[in-house]
Amino acid sequence: MGVSYYMGDLNPTLPFAMSQLEYGGVIRFNYNNRWTFRADYAYATVKADDKIIKWRPERELNFTSKIHDLSFVAEFNFLEYYTGNPKRNVSPYIFGGISVFYYTPFAEINGELVNLRYENPKTKTLRYTEPPLPDNAKWYDRLAYKSMPVGFSIPFGVGVKLALSKHMAATMEWRMEKTFTDYLDDVGTVYPEQHAKYIDVNGTEFDLTDPTGNYKPGQQRGNSAFNDWFGMARVSLTWKFNLPDGRGCNLSKF
């Protein structure tokens, strides 16, 4: 369990800004005293708001993305480490690997999260359909979304592990994920001619592409030269199960 954060078009410079809760689980295989291989699952939320981050407050954009992340990484212990050995019970480590994640971006309108992704197979435009809206709410067509709901990333980071008993260990780590998408925040390139608009149950119209109404098509909306990142800082507890050959496999929730 820990916190997750985002860095990208709305927040290019401030780690841990607007951090959110993240949680998940890990299965770890201790190959030897130096090398460990593991599979991680994490459910994380990342968000940013121009009015709070103030990198470009005049845009007045905001987003919240829900992320389901599955990664496979290798850890290298700087010191010989073995859970249950009082002489080898602590070590800093580094890790790296590959990750696949599913994400859904939302915009916040008057405290309500509006889903920014749905492609209509007939018109190749996006409409808001899930979760269901009231009958008198509408979603206007917008340009086809320029990303898939599934992304790939390279996770890497540093941490420290400490054996608490013969079978239990604790780890603390900081992790970054370099993604290959610029649409984790639904912001990229320039303002299009066709805007995403939402009308609430009271008939109030909101422009999700340009809330200010001050930008013309072709003006810069985001920075497409750099893809988005997200990171996590977490603490985990693991429990070691001995395999038949004596090697350990740590199963945990964090």
What are these regions, as identified by a protein language model?
Residues 35, 40-127:
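Gram-negative (and chloroplast) outer-membrane scaffold detector with strong preference
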Residues 7-14, 56-64, 81, 140-146, ...:
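Extracellular loop and loop/strand-boundary signature of outer-membrane beta-barrel proteins
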Residues 34-37, 82, 167-170, 243-246:
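Repeated loop/turn-to-beta-strand initiation elements of outer-membrane beta-barrel proteins
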Residues 1-30, 105, 230, 234, ...:
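Short glycine/proline- and aromatic-enriched beta-strand/turn motifs that initiate or cap beta-hairpins
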Residues 17-23, 66-70, 90, 146-154, ...:
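Residues that define the transmembrane beta-barrel architecture of outer-membrane proteins
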Residues 4-8, 40, 44-48, 99-105, ...:
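Structural signature of outer-membrane beta-barrel domains
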Residues 99-228:
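Outer-membrane beta-barrel transmembrane domain signature
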Residues 1-3, 25-29, 72-78, 96-100, ...:
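Residues on the lipid-exposed face of transmembrane beta-strands in outer-membrane beta-barrel proteins
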